[in-house]
């Protein structure tokens, strides 16, 4: 039914490379190249803005996709700022809801990606800009709802809660 998809959320943490015996033998540029080689295997690549800048010296998702041999779909998040994306040959910028009531951002990126994958699969892979925007907005609400309480696990949004929130934006 679906072809195999490899989704990578880089979650770069410099601290895991700074003190390993492996990293002491290679330069920072070599580390960047190793990571980029790994990212060549992705079908969908989710990056934070800082990761896009560090590994690709760019935040344009289309240009990042073109730098990788697999030409993945690319999503770039940046906290409360709009999400940049290149998906299924289309490129866009999607505003996602924000709140003044943020308690804890732990798990927001994971919730975003989980929501995106869920919507991606349930929609049969988006073919047009509206469907892609719907997936991104759904994912954004998943990330936001996770931030409204403490911890990543307790605040995991249920499908119904996300749809109710999205419905309140429309009415």
PLM regions and their residue ranges:
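Conserved small/polar residues in nucleotide/adenosyl-binding loops
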Residues: 1-5
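Conserved phosphate/ATP/ADP-binding segment of small-molecule kinases
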Residues: 14-93
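Conserved phosphate-binding/catalytic region of the ribokinase-like
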Residues: 59-171
